[in-house]
Amino acid sequence: METQEVMREIQYEEFEEKIIEIRRTSKVTKGGKNLSFRVVAIVGNKNGKVGLGIGKAREVPEAIRKAIADAKKNVIEVPVINGTIPHEVIGRQDASRVLLKPAAPGTGIIAGGTVRAVVELAGIQNILTKALGSTNPLNLAMATINGLKELLDPRKVAKLRDITVEEVYRGVRREGNA
């Protein structure tokens, strides 16, 4: 049991953490208002792994701890090629949409605060983004994560189509694959 806990700690040490939002919420009861906090956190290793978590508690530090733990449980793998994403994608979450486009080396990260935090921690250095619709920080972060989940690694696409990676980039079609 202890070895599993040690392995988890080693696995998580490499992650960098960012707090996206701290929101005070209140529940009205007949005894008065019960205040609590909701925290949205992002973790990533700047090398293709990123996760999003939400924590709720009566105190801010406890909510932050819960959010970071939740983010570490929800880590996804992002295909990063030459510092950018392999293809254009639109991530969606409720009324928020995020357009993610690959960019040439030297472009940098063209993104707003929430989307920037997610793509930086994913290890993407060159990307063009545009937030469409609602700009709620939680929904934007989730839309970005959903978009990154939809990305396809060119090597996997080439293997599925039984062609080379170069042919994937050139858009070559084989006879019979109309």
Swiss-Prot record:
Residues 15-78 form the S5 DRBM domain. GO terms for cellular component: small ribosomal subunit. The keyword Phosphoprotein does not apply. GO terms for molecular function: rRNA binding; structural constituent of ribosome. Keywords: Ribonucleoprotein, Ribosomal protein, RNA-binding, rRNA-binding. InterPro entries: Ribosomal_Su5_D2-typ_SF (IPR020568), Ribosomal_uS5 (IPR000851), Ribosomal_uS5_bac-type (IPR005712), Ribosomal_uS5_C (IPR005324), Ribosomal_uS5_N (IPR013810), Ribosomal_uS5_N_CS (IPR018192), Ribsml_uS5_D2-typ_fold_subgr (IPR014721). GO terms for biological process: translation. PROSITE patterns: RIBOSOMAL_S5, S5_DSRBD. The keyword Ribosomal protein applies. Coiled coil: none annotated. It comes from the Bacteria. Belongs to the universal ribosomal protein uS5 family. Part of the 30S ribosomal subunit. Contacts proteins S4 and S8. The N-terminal domain interacts with the head of the 30S subunit; the C-terminal domain interacts with the body and contacts protein S4. The interaction surface between S4 and S5 is involved in control of translational fidelity. With S4 and S12 plays an important role in translational accuracy. NCBIfam families: rpsE_bact. This is Small ribosomal subunit protein uS5. It comes from Thermotoga neapolitana (strain ATCC 49049 / DSM 4359 / NBRC 107923 / NS-E).
